[in-house]
C-alpha cells in the first residue's frame, strides 16, 4: 500500500531524495489549507477559549510547530507561495486577487502564470494522481475570464469555488462567497469538499495521490447549519464564529475517520495549517495575543498553526519550538519526502525542511524570510497598532518591518518579544540598515510587474 502524506491546510536546482524515503513506495499527499484561521483558533494552541477536539487529536498524534509562517497575510499570495515555493510577489501577486480594475490598482497580475513551477507539476511528473478540491483564488472568477484552467497547474481533476476558473455550479450560484441559491449551502461546503477528497482517494488507490483540500472555512461570512441558522446576529459575530469552527472541527474528524476506513490512515502524513491570520481577532484571542491580523505582517497575520501527523513515522505528542519554517518550504520539502524533483530553471525561495517535518531534527531556514503586502485603497483594515508596514524580513530571531520608501522601520526580537511590543530599531541602527536594504532591494528587483 502506498505511503500517504496529508497536508492540512504557500531553492534552485534538483532535490535529492532521502535514502530512507527512496526505499519506500511513494506517499500520497493531501494538502488541507484552512482559510483565515488564526493560531489562537485551536484549543491545542490556546488557553481553551474555543474547543477543537478533533484537530487537537490530530496534534496529539503528531508534531506541532510554533514557528511556521505563511508567505503572505492574505489569501491569494499565500496560496501562490505554498504552490510555487517562491515568495508570491515574485509572481506579481501581493494581495487578494480581485476584479481586473482592483488588480490593476494593486499593481498586481490577474492570475498566477501557468508557466510557474508548482508542487502538482513536480508530483505528477513523479507518477502521482493530482486533484485540487476547494478554494483556488490564484486567478479566475469575478471578471477575469482568461485565467488558465486549473489543469494547467498540474491537476488532473478539480472542484473549485467562485474564486477560480470554471467554478462548481452547485456551490457557486452567484459571484459571491455564498448564496441562498447554492445547491450546497454555505454550512455544508466543507463536508462536500471532504466527501470529494475521500472519493478521489478511494478511486485512485492504485497509485500515489496528491490532493489539495482547501476549504473556505474559517473565512467569513460565518453561517452555521440549520441548527443555528437563521439567527439575527451579524455574520461576523463571535457566536457564529464558534458555531462554524465547531462544525469545521467535526469535518476534520470525519476526514480522518474516512482515511481509517480507506485503510490509509497509518500511511498518511497530516499537516494542518492556515493561509493567513484571522480577522476579526476578537481582541487578539484568535491570534493568541500576537499583534496584528489578516492583512498585517505582524505575527498575528503570518504566524500560523502547523501540525504534522504520520503514525508510525513521526513521533506523537511532540512540539517543535525551534524550527522556523515558511510555506514556501513545503514544495521542496514534500518533493524530498515523495522522491519528486523540483522543476528546473527557477530561483526558489523555499528550502528543504523535510527533516523538521518528519521530526528527525529541528531546522531553521538559512535564507531570509521575506514578505510584501500591497497597500492601497482596499486595505482599510487593520488600523492603528495592528497595521504594519508593507515589507518584512526575518533573519534568525530578528524581524524587521519597513515600507518600500525606507520609512517606518520597526525591529523586533521575536524570540523574546513574540507579540512585537518593543521596537528595537533605535538600538540597532546598523542591523536595521542592512535588513531594510535587503528587503527593499528584493522588492524592487524581484517582484513581477503587471504589464497590462
Predicted regions and their residues:
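C-terminal cap/loop subdomain of S1 sulfatases and analogous C-terminal strand-loop tails that border
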Residues: 278-297, 314-323, 328-414, 445-446
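A short beta-strand-to-alpha-helix junction
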Residues: 47-52, 69-74, 106-117, 184-193, ...
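Active-site segment of extracytoplasmic enzymes that catalyze sulfate/phosphate-ester chemistry
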Residues: 31, 39-118, 122-128, 142, ...
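Short, solvent-exposed turn/loop segments enriched in Gly/Ser/Thr/Pro and often Arg
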Residues: 44-49, 64-86, 94-96, 132-143, ...
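Bacterial Sec-dependent N-terminal signal peptides
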Residues: 1-25
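A short aromatic-rich beta-strand->coil structural motif
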Residues: 29, 35, 123, 135, ...
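Formylglycine-dependent
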Residues: 95-129, 136-211, 215-229, 242, ...
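Histidine-centered active-site microenvironments of extracellular/periplasmic hydrolases
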Residues: 143-154, 221-224, 234, 257-313, ...
